[in-house]
């Protein structure tokens, strides 16, 4: 019987506000011993610096492997490299547009396109408001080709006391899509 490989997920962090979702996803994947492959756009790095106290190196060290956004020859740019899916957290309008239109001008969008063509799960935590019809059409187009749109909408039935609790609830729901159980995640009616 062949050896089982570890669960392997790609995490993309773009320049949209809400980079804490991507950072927390990496932290939880590490806690769950999930192999994570990270791509951060240049604007993602800028937003990390603006929104958090994390140094880029600290975020990168959370991942099992890190790739430069311009490295289109990276292993995750090929469907022959086995991964279980990809999470873009947060997902900018630019990235949503690239995914919806199959545009592969950087490693993050190439990896997303490969994820879809290989029929693997791609979650886009689209972070924009308010929306105009063009945004809605892009979301519909991305959904039609297989992406899962999961805007980081907070839930309040858990009676969150901190921003961290709001973030954890959303990250936990995303990881549910791979059958990964986030410790301490509050569920409806439980």
Protein language model features and the residues they cover:
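A cross-family phosphate/adenosyl-ligand binding-site feature
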Residues: 1-123, 127-190
């Amino acid at each position: 019987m062949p050896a089982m490989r570890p669960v392997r997920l790609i995490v993309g962090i773009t320049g949209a506000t809400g980079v804490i979702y991507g950072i927390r996803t990496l932290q939880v994947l590490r806690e769950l011993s999930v192999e994570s492959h990270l791509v951060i756009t240049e604007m993602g790095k800028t937003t990390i610096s603006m929104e958090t106290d994390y140094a880029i190196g600290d975020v990168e060290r959370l991942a099992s492997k890190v790739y430069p956004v311009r490295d289109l020859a990276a292993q995750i740019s090929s469907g022959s490299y086995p991964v279980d899916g990809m999470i873009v957290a947060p997902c900018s309008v630019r990235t949503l547009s690239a995914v919806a239109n199959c545009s592969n001008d950087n490693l993050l969008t190439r990896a997303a396109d490969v994820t879809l063509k290989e029929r693997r799960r791609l979650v886009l935590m689209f972070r924009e408001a308010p929306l105009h019809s063009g945004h809605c059409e892009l979301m519909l187009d991305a959904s039609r080709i297989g992406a899962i749109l999961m805007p980081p909408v907070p839930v309040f039935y858990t009676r969150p006391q901190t921003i961290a609790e709001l973030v954890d609830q959303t990250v936990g729901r995303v990881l549910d899509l791979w059958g990964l159980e986030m410790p301490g995640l509050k569920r409806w009616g439980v």
